[in-house]
Amino acid sequence: ARKKDTDVIALWPSLNGGTVLSADNQTFSTANVHAAISRAKANNFGNQLYIIHHPNAVAELSKASATTADTAAAAGLTNGWSVDLLQNFYSGLRPINGVSIFEDGNIGKISTTDSGYGVIADKTAMAALNSVDTRTERQRDASLRATEVVMTADYGVFELDDSRGAAFRAEIGDLSFS
């Protein structure tokens, strides 16, 4: 699952011809999130928008926000999302302008900076195609005196409609305790 996740994340900076919203040293603030949402709506990204970003970026937003809730049900996960599948990734923030925000801890830092690429997109921007579902096999390795668990899957991830999303750059470094 992590491999598939990182394959999808790697496509985000290419969305919309490489358009990146925000920049290095910019926090995932309410103002920046509103700017990204308004840009997405003004440029016809679609009607089922979502944002995915690193938990540290989302924490920065929730720290400054008075609209937090503790569960997907309490926060009202936007209609059309499968709560049972996504509640563990849902940030718990009430949707901002109707846009749900999800967290993904697999988003990595961009080279030597503390920022990372999240995404704002419509549900029709990207697709995953599975030709073989995940299979788990056990393989005995006598030299290690162990049994390895091998997982395989055959899938592809790709941009379905490039114009329906854009990368969203923000700081993802650890928050301070002060």
Q: Where does each model-flagged region fall?
A:
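Alpha-helical scaffold segments that mediate packing/assembly in large oligomeric complexes
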Residues: 1-43, 47, 169-178
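Detector for Asparagine
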Residues: 16, 25, 32, 43-47, ...
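Aromatic-enriched hydrophobic runs in primary sequence
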Residues: 21, 29-39, 57, 63, ...
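Hydrophobic, aromatic-enriched interface-forming segments
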Residues: 32-73
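Sequence/fold signature of self-assembling virion shell proteins
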Residues: 64-178
